[in-house]
Structures are given as structure tokens and as C-alpha cells.
């Protein structure tokens, strides 16, 4: 067949030519359709997640005596199911090298309810028991992925809690969950704006009941952008020092209540276990611990939101808190400062408001490096050195402010270079030395010629 079009010379088109053209057209459209589908899926995910956050509301509960008894049964049954199936998994692995997963254990749970010896677990919400098995599955997953230690058995002294995965509602200052048709009196001090998902009911050592309601909601009013960046150095003398020289004091709540707590614990040790006096004194000790925990959390919330409000990019050190606690001289102070909790609060608040938290590598010698010329002063490894002067550029440094400035510079450079997260310490040291070599050589040359 011969084709001629728009004045071009006539060409002969064979069957092979038709097939070649047809194949190219199909391939072209298929490739572009695939690309469009990928882009469309990404846009759908982005639009669906845009402005949505998961938020937890915590409210105080005031159950009556009958409800408190039923809550106690829920706590006990959830703990029993968790321990029963943890023991089953351990025995199965010991005998066969394998163990049941969640789905197999859920079937076993159904059979367990039919047995006369364990029929009492039917008195509580079935979904609560299923969630206990799910929690065990998550604990195993975290262990295998090296995010946590191997799961332990729960004792009566462990945190009393259980989770209801669905059918949760709050109305007229009452919490409605399965098995509690009349609702539990609840102090709803904040409006719940999102869609309620699961709820976790807990009892503190001081005897107070709380519900943590998990929601998904739209975050309609993110904080305004400031176009400002900051570096944070976390310490023990002061909790935080910013690259602008601002300090957030370390309130040392454990030390503040140390004498009161020691006195209360001393009185507890003199009481007879099981007596009414022992229980009353135990509650006093628990309330002091609760006061310390609540005061610390309140202060950390205030510090974190203050920083997120004022800065768009926040650079911090990725500290190995667990490793630092091995220093028995500092372990108590590090625990009291609660750096890990602060970083968690800072991160999710920044995420909610479209701000960025950059974690720089722990191997970066932020306290030893001059932020002006890059000279590394090994003498400042000694924590008692709070101020020092650079022998190269003669800049006077406050140890903590200098560290915060270096953290800021390193974090911003990491963003621009696309190397925020490092995993290899040797690679970090090599990059640091390479990046500072030119600065150091220029500084030493100027010193020699000066």
C-alpha cells in the first residue's frame, strides 16, 4: 500500500510497518497512562492526608462502684489474655521453633471462651480481648524490628489499661463504650472536633480513672510561617539553649519533690502490707509521683509550642539518651530532664503546623567547634569548660550557645545538601573533616600571616 500526505513523497507501507507504528502508539500511551495513574494516586494520597492529624484527648472519668468493678474486670481480663497468649507463643517456639500469629490466636481465644475454666472472660467486651492479642502482635513486631525489647508478662502492678477499638462515643459528659450502656461520667473539658476512633481506659497508681480518645481531624488553623530557623542545644544546667542565646531553665522536678517523696516512702515502709494505713500511704506516694510527672509534662508542652510558634526550621541533636543514661552520675538528671519526651512533643507539633525538625548526627562535635572559623578545640570535651576563646580567630564562646549555633549551621547545610540523616559514624566524621578543611586552612593561614 502506498500513502501520500500533505505533499510529502509517497511511501510504501507494509504489514510490518503497520505493526511497528501500532506497537509504538500502544507503548507510548501505556507508558503515559501509567505515569498519569501514579501521579493521580500520589495526589489522592496528598489531598486525603492534607491538613489531617491524629489527636488524642484525655479526660478524667468518674465511675460509680458498679462501673469501677466492671472496669477492674476489663483490666484483669485484658491482662490475662495478653499473658496467656504470650506464654503460648513462648512455649510453641520452645517446642517447634515457630509460634501462632494474631489470626491463629484469635481463633484460640474464641475456643477459650467456651471452656468452663475460662468462661469468665466473656463478661467483658470481646473486642477488648482481641485488641490485647493485637497488642501482643505489635510487641513482637517491634521486637523483631529492634524497636523494643522482648515482650514481658504484665503483673497486677503494671499499668492498668484496656483499649476499645470501636463503638466509642461521648455525649452529655458521659463516655459510652460496649458493656457500659448507661455511660461513665466524664469531665469533657475540651471540645472533640474530629472523628472518634479507639479509646484507652486507664487507672493510675493514685486511683484515678482516665480515658484517652484517639481521633482523626482536620487541622484547620496551622501556625503562621515566620521564615526563621533555630538551633537547640539540650543540656542539664539549662534544659534548652537556642542559637539566639535564649535559655529555657531546667526545673528539675524530681529534685524539687525529692525530700517530700523520700519522707512519704519512708512512712510507707513502716506500714504493714495489706492494711488500710498501707493503702492510704501508698496513694500519697503515688500522688507525689503523679505531681512530678504532670508538672514536667506541662512545662515541656509549653517549651515545645513556644519554639514551634516562632520558628519554621528547628535543628536539634539526635542524642543517644539510652546510652547516656549508662553514666550513673548523670542518669538521674537526664531522666528528670526528659529530653526524649521533649523531642517527641516538638516533632509532632512541628508536623501539625507544617514546620520542620532536623535531627543532626550525634557524632557532630557541636560544643568543640568554633562556629566562626571551624577550629575544633579538644579541650572543651571537659564539661566543666563553660566558656572558651578560639585560639585561631580569638572569638569568645559560651559553650552552649556556640553548640546551638553549630547545630543550626550543620542542620541547614544538611537540608541544602540532602544529607540530613546519617547512619554511619565514620561517614559523618569524614564529611565533617572534609567540610571544615578549607575553613581551617584559611584560618591557620591568616593566623600565620597576621
Each predicted region: which residue ranges?
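Acidic carboxylate diad motif detector
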Residues: 103-204
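Short polybasic amphipathic segments
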Residues: 168, 173-179, 238-242, 386-389
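Substrate-contacting helices/loops that form the catalytic groove of nucleic-acid
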Residues: 95-118, 196, 204-343, 416-450
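Gly/serine-rich nucleotide phosphate-binding loop at the start of the catalytic core
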Residues: 19-22, 27-29, 34-129
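Positively charged, low-complexity nucleic-acid-binding target-recognition regions
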Residues: 26-28, 32-49, 54, 332-333, ...
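Short acidic-glycine loop/turn motifs at beta-strand connectors
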Residues: 171, 205, 243-246, 373, ...
Amino acid at each position: 500500500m502506498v500513502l501520500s500526505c500533505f505533499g510529502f513523497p509517497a511511501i510504501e507501507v507494509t504489514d510490518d510497518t503497520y505493526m511497528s507504528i501500532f506497537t509504538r502508539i500502544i507503548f507510548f500511551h501505556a507508558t503515559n497512562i501509567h505515569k498519569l495513574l501514579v501521579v493521580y494516586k500520589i495526589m489522592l494520597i496528598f489531598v486525603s492526608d492534607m491538613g489531617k492529624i491524629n489527636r488524642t484527648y484525655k479526660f478524667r472519668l468518674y465511675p460509680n462502684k458498679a462501673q469501677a468493678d466492671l472496669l477492674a474486670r476489663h483490666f484483669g481480663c485484658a491482662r490475662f489474655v495478653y499473658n496467656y497468649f504470650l506464654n503460648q507463643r513462648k512455649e510453641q517456639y520452645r517446642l517447634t521453633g515457630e509460634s501462632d500469629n494474631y489470626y491463629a490466636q484469635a481463633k484460640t481465644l474464641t475456643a477459650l471462651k467456651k471452656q468452663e475454666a475460662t468462661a469468665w472472660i466473656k463478661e467483658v467486651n470481646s473486642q477488648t480481648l482481641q485488641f490485647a492479642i493485637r497488642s501482643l502482635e505489635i510487641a513482637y513486631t517491634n521486637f523483631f524490628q529492634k524497636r523494643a525489647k522482648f515482650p514481658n508478662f504484665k503483673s497486677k502492678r503494671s499499668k492498668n489499661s484496656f483499649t476499645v477499638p470501636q463503638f466509642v462515643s461521648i455525649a452529655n459528659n458521659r463516655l459510652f463504650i460496649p458493656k457500659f450502656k448507661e455511660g461513665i461520667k466524664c469531665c469533657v473539658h475540651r471540645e472533640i472536633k474530629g472523628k472518634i476512633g479507639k479509646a484507652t481506659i486507664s487507672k493510675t497508681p493514685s486511683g484515678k480513672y482516665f480515658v484517652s480518645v484517639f481521633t482523626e481531624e482536620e487541622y484547620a488553623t496551622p501556625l503562621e510561617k515566620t521564615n526563621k530557623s533555630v538551633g537547640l542545644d539540650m543540656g542539664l544546667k539549662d534544659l534548652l539553649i537556642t542559637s539566639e542565646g535564649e535559655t529555657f531553665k531546667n526545673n528539675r522536678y524530681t529534685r524539687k519533690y525529692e525530700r517530700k517523696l523520700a519522707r512519704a516512702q519512708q512512712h510507707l515502709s513502716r506500714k504493714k502490707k495489706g492494711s488500710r494505713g498501707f493503702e492510704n500511704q501508698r496513694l500519697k506516694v503515688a500522688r507525689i509521683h503523679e505531681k512530678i510527672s504532670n508538672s514536667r509534662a506541662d512545662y515541656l508542652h509549653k517549651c515545645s509550642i513556644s519554639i514551634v510558634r516562632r520558628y519554621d526550621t528547628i535543628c536539634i541533636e539526635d542524642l543517644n539518651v539510652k546510652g547516656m543514661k549508662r553514666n550513673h552520675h548523670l542518669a538521674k538528671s537526664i531522666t528528670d530532664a526528659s529530653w526524649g519526651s521533649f523531642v517527641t512533643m516538638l516533632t509532632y507539633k512541628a508536623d501539625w503546623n507544617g514546620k520542620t525538625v532536623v535531627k543532626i548526627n550525634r557524632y557532630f562535635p557541636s560544643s568543640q567547634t568554633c562556629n566562626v572559623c571551624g577550629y575544633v578545640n579538644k579541650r572543651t570535651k571537659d564539661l566543666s569548660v563553660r566558656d572558651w576563646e578560639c585560639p585561631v580567630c580569638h572569638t569568645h564562646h559560651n559553650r552552649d550557645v556556640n553548640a546551638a549555633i553549630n547545630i543550626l549551621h550543620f542542620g541547614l547545610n544538611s537540608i541544602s545538601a540532602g544529607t540530613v540523616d546519617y547512619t554511619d559514624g565514620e561517614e559523618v566524621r569524614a564529611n565533617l573533616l572534609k567540610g571544615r578543611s578549607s575553613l581551617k586552612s584559611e584560618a591557620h593561614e591568616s593566623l600565620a600571616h597576621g
